[in-house]
C-alpha cells in the first residue's frame, strides 16, 4: 500500500518499484533467447548440456545450418518473403496513407475501418480466410510463394498505413501549403518536401514489415504448398518436435541477427531523417518555381 500511496502522492516521480518490475520483465524475456543462442555454439549435439564453444553448427559439420539443404532453403525463403513484403507493402501503404489522409468524402470512415481490420483480426482467422480465397476464388494462383507473399503483404499493409498516417498528422499541412503558395506543382511538393519528412515513418514501417514477415508462422503455414515453401518458423516448429540438433538454434540465431541488424539500421536511418527535418524548409525555399 505504501508503494501505491507514494505513487499517487507524486505520480510524476521516479518509482523504484517500476524499475524493478521492468528489469525483471526484460531479464525474463532475454533468458530463453540467450539460452537458444548459446546452444547454437555448442560443440556437441546436445541441446541441454553445453560442452564448449564451436561454430560447427553454422558451417562446419554435416547437418549444419549452411550444409543442410532444408535449413538453408528455409532461411533463404524467409528472406525472400520478407524482401517481397517490404518492397510491395511499404510503397503501397505509403500511397494508401496519403490517399486516406486526404479523403473526406462518403465512405472514408468505412474505408479507414477496413484498413485497420487486419490489425484486430486474429491471425488464424486471416490465414483460414486467405486459404479459402486462394483455393476457391484465385485457384489460378495456387498455394506457394506467391500466395504467401500476398498473405503477408495483406497482413502487414495496415502497419505501414497506421505509422505513415501518424506521421502525416504530426507534420500537418503547413509545408505542403507553403510549397503550393510558392507555385510548386503537387508532385514536386510531394517529392521534395513531404517524402523527406515522411522518411522516419517509411523506414520504421519497412523495418516492422520485414520483422513481421520473417517471424510470421500462421499465414505462411496455411498458404504453403509443401517443403519447398517452408520458412524458418515453420521448420523450427516441425523439426523441434522430433530430434532437433543445435543447427536449428544456429538458423534461429542467424534470423535473429538479421532482424536485429535490420532494426538497428532502420533506427540509424530514422535518426538521420529526424535530425534533418529542418531541411524541408530549405527545400521549400529552393524550389525551382
Annotate each language-model stretch with its function.
Residues 2-11, 83-115, 128, 132-136, ...:
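Transmembrane-helix boundary motif in ABC transporter permease subunits
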Residues 2-6, 12, 17-20, 107, ...:
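C-terminal transmembrane helix and the adjacent membrane-cytosol boundary/short C-terminal tail
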Residues 4-8, 55, 107, 124-156, ...:
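Membrane-interfacial helix termini and adjacent extracytoplasmic/periplasmic loops
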Residues 8-14, 45, 52, 57-69, ...:
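Interhelical loop and adjacent transmembrane-helix boundary motif
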Residues 20-33, 153, 160-164, 171-172, ...:
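Transmembrane alpha-helices
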Residues 30-45, 77, 127-139, 207-213, ...:
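A structural signal for multi-pass alpha-helical bundles of membrane permease subunits
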Residues 33, 82, 86-94, 98, ...:
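Hydrophobic positions within alpha-helical transmembrane segments of bacterial inner-membrane proteins
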Residues 70-80, 135-159, 199-202, 206:
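Loop-to-helix entry region at the N-terminal start of transmembrane alpha-helices
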Amino acid at each position: 500500500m505504501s508503494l501505491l500511496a507514494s505513487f499517487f502522492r507524486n505520480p510524476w516521480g521516479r518509482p523504484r518499484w517500476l524499475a524493478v518490475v521492468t528489469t525483471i520483465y526484460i531479464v525474463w524475456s532475454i533468458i530463453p533467447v540467450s539460452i537458444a543462442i548459446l546452444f547454437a555454439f555448442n560443440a556437441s549435439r546436445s541441446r541441454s548440456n553445453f560442452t564448449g564453444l564451436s561454430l560447427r553448427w553454422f558451417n562446419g559439420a554435416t547437418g549444419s545450418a549452411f550444409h543442410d539443404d532444408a535449413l538453408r532453403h528455409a532461411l533463404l525463403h524467409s528472406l525472400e518473403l520478407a524482401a517481397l513484403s517490404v518492397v510491395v507493402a511499404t510503397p503501397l501503404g505509403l500511397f494508401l496513407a496519403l490517399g486516406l489522409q486526404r479523403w473526406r468524402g462518403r465512405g472514408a470512415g468505412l474505408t479507414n475501418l477496413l484498413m485497420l481490420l487486419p490489425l484486430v483480426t486474429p491471425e488464424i482467422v486471416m490465414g483460414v480466410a486467405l486459404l479459402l480465397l486462394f483455393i476457391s476464388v484465385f485457384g489460378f494462383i495456387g498455394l506457394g510463394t506467391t500466395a504467401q507473399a500476398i498473405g503477408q503483404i495483406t497482413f502487414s499493409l495496415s502497419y505501414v498505413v497506421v505509422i505513415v498516417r501518424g506521421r502525416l498528422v504530426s507534420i500537418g499541412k503547413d509545408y505542403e501549403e507553403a510549397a503550393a503558395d510558392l507555385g510548386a506543382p503537387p508532385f514536386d511538393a510531394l517529392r521534395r518536401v513531404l517524402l523527406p519528412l515522411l522518411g522516419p515513418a517509411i523506414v520504421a514501417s519497412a523495418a516492422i514489415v520485414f520483422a513481421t514477415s520473417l517471424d510470421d508462422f500462421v499465414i505462411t503455414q496455411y498458404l504453403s504448398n509443401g517443403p519447398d515453401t517452408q520458412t524458418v518458423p515453420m521448420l523450427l516448429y516441425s523439426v523441434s518436435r522430433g530430434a532437433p540438433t543445435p543447427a536449428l538454434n544456429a538458423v534461429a540465431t542467424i534470423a535473429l541477427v538479421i532482424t536485429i541488424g535490420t532494426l538497428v539500421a532502420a533506427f540509424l536511418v530514422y535518426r538521420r531523417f529526424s535530425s534533418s527535418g529542418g531541411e524541408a524548409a530549405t527545400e521549400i525555399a529552393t524550389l525551382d518555381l
